[in-house]
């Protein structure tokens, strides 16, 4: 009987040990991510009183936009938004529209069609250069400068002006996650003063580089540049690129990862006009600016940044916008070319 009691006690003890040994280990605290909101707030406070730059005035309506307008948005690929300043006031999207229409055309016709019919090289000329067209031996322009952008817009699928416009505005709306509209005063102002773009389109047509009616294509391009956006819209647009073409807020598939890949390559090459090289040298992210004061930056797989601040530098890029993006990228160590050693250096022999 005593032996039986010992055996029973041993079984009970063994059971206790088993129970104890299978108890789930304590969970370690999950690592915290970047404090995006604090970083955005800090950047806003740092630059809100900066007075450098000047509104674009070659389009009369842009000169009337308040020069102190300033808003920052950052949207992550999981759909979280962090903002500071004025994120509601609208400005015209201007040249940022170029990369959304580019993404649509790549989606419809493939990346090779853009390379063959427009080009993907930097021109080394100003964004609205006419001489760049005549100096080219082939299709060495790109969709981020006016000649290439107008040609790209002419490639949008549709059997009528209305069908093409629906494709353009729907694409912009899907990227931004809401129905966007045109700023009619800006559109009318640009349409009345876009003789240079009309000339560019006619010259492209003469060189067989326009793929639809040049006058109507120029008007479509002018209209897309007048689409209204705010800082949050721009951040969501950038985040949609960062998320491989799926809007991280709405979940809508806007374009494919392949279209994003090739669009970002063109943005990295020529997204900030004459200062694209300087931008990439310091920021290391694909970006796109517009003379309305907007700017976007895309950190693939992580987040998108959008800034609205109308005063521009000599190259036509938002002064505050560039500084904000550079600060945020530096703080987040998000430069795509920032590489830490993978294999440590060998120990020095004594």
For every predicted segment, state its role.
Residues 1-11:
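Bacterial N-terminal signal peptides that target proteins for export
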Residues 16-31:
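Bacterial Sec-dependent signal peptides at the C-terminal "C-region" and cleavage site
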Residues 27-72:
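Beta-lactamase-like hydrolase cores
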Residues 29, 243-350:
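Structured C-terminal helix/loop/strand segments within mature extracytoplasmic catalytic/sensor domains
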Residues 31-42, 50-52, 105-224:
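Active-site-adjacent helix/loop patches that line small-molecule binding or acyl-intermediate pockets
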Residues 59, 65, 75-89:
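Short, conserved catalytic-motif segment at the N-terminal edge
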Residues 79, 92-115, 237, 305:
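Active-site SXXK
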Residues 99, 200, 228-246, 299-310:
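Active-site-proximal alpha-helical segments within enzyme catalytic domains
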């Amino acid at each position: 009987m005593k032996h039986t009691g010992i055996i029973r006690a041993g079984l009970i003890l063994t059971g206790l040990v088993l129970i104890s040994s299978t108890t789930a280990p304590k969970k370690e605290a999950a690592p915290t991510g970047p404090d995006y909101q604090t970083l955005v707030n800090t950047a806003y406070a740092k630059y809100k009183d900066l007075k450098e730059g000047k509104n674009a005035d070659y389009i009369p309506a842009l000169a009337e936009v308040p020069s102190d307008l300033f808003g920052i948005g950052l949207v992550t690929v999981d759909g979280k938004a962090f903002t500071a300043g004025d994120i509601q006031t609208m400005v015209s999207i201007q040249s940022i529209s170029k990369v959304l229409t580019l993404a649509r055309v790549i989606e419809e016709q493939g990346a090779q069609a853009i390379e063959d019919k427009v080009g993907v090289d930097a021109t080394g000329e100003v964004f609205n250069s006419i001489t760049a067209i005549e100096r080219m031996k082939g299709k060495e322009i790109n969709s981020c400068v006016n000649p290439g952008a107008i040609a790209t817009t002419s490639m949008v699928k549709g059997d009528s002006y209305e069908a093409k416009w629906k494709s353009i505005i729907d694409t912009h709306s899907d990227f931004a996650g809401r129905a966007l509209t045109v700023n009619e005063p800006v559109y009318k102002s640009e349409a009345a003063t876009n003789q240079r773009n009309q000339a560019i389109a006619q010259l492209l047509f003469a060189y067989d580089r326009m793929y639809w009616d040049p006058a109507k294509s120029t008007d479509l391009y002018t209209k897309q540049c007048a689409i209204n956006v705010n800082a949050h819209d721009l951040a969501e647009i950038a985040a949609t690129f960062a998320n491989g073409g799926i809007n991280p807020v709405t979940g809508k598939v806007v374009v494919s990862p392949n279209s994003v890949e090739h669009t970002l390559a063109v943005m990295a090459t020529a997204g900030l006009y004459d200062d694209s090289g300087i931008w990439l040298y310091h920021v290391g992210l694909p970006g796109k600016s517009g003379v309305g004061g907007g700017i976007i930056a895309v950190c693939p797989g992580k987040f998108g940044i959008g800034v609205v601040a109308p005063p521009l530098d000599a190259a036509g890029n938002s002064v505050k916008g560039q500084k904000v993006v550079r600060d945020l990228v530096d703080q987040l160590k998000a430069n795509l070319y920032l590489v830490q050693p993978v294999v440590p250096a060998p120990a020095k022999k004594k």
